[in-house]
């Protein structure tokens, strides 16, 4: 990410230049943090604000965690539930949790849900040992080039996404690279 920013490929997303330390170390963002619990929610066609939907689910999960492990499982003084709202490397945490891989379209792709997902996180103050933790999923795009070929501006080039060339960066409405992705077939 640092190299991508240094090359100016992030365009005017200046917020990506700030708080880099927090992006790489959640304990700076949430003092006492030891674990990032991640979840994915498939795109909702209803038009509801996904931030609210994901956070609502995470607040319910937080209540269950507090019931099971006590109030100290989360920070009482710092925001610890996030959905596209804090300097978090959301895709990185999802990959590490085994929830998907980063595809050639530079999106997180879950093998079943596809890339039309919204991640959310709860940062907790306890280490978590998961007996059946999934290993990170290998990049499964193989020889597929559909997203690269579908990109109307050439913003997707092999290992690089150039935000300054991406239509979604300027309009928020281009999904061409996702619409052609085989992992999104029949998922709408």
PLM regions: where:
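Auxiliary alpha/beta "docking" domains used to position bulky ligands
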Residues: 1-132, 136-140, 168, 187-188
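Iron-sulfur cluster-binding cysteine motifs and their immediate structural context
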Residues: 146-168, 172-188
């Amino acid at each position: 990410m640092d190299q991508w920013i240094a090359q100016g490929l992030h365009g005017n997303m200046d917020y990506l230049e700030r708080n880099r330390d927090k992006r790489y170390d959640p304990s700076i963002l949430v003092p006492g943090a030891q674990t990032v619990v991640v979840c994915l929610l498939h795109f909702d066609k209803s038009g509801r604000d996904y931030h609210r939907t994901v956070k609502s689910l995470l607040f319910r999960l937080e209540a269950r965690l507090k019931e099971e492990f006590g109030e100290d499982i989360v920070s009482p003084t710092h925001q610890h539930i996030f959905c596209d709202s804090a300097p978090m490397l959301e895709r990185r945490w999802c990959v590490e949790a085994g929830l998907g891989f980063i595809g050639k379209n530079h999106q997180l792709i879950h093998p079943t849900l596809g890339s039309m997902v919204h991640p959310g996180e709860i940062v907790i103050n306890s280490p978590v040992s998961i007996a059946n933790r999934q290993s990170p999923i290998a990049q499964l795009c193989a020889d597929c080039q559909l997203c690269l070929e579908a990109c109307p501006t050439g913003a997707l080039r092999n290992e690089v996404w150039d935000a300054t060339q991406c239509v979604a960066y300027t309009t928020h409405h281009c999904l061409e690279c996702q619409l052609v992705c085989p992992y999104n077939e029949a998922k709408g």
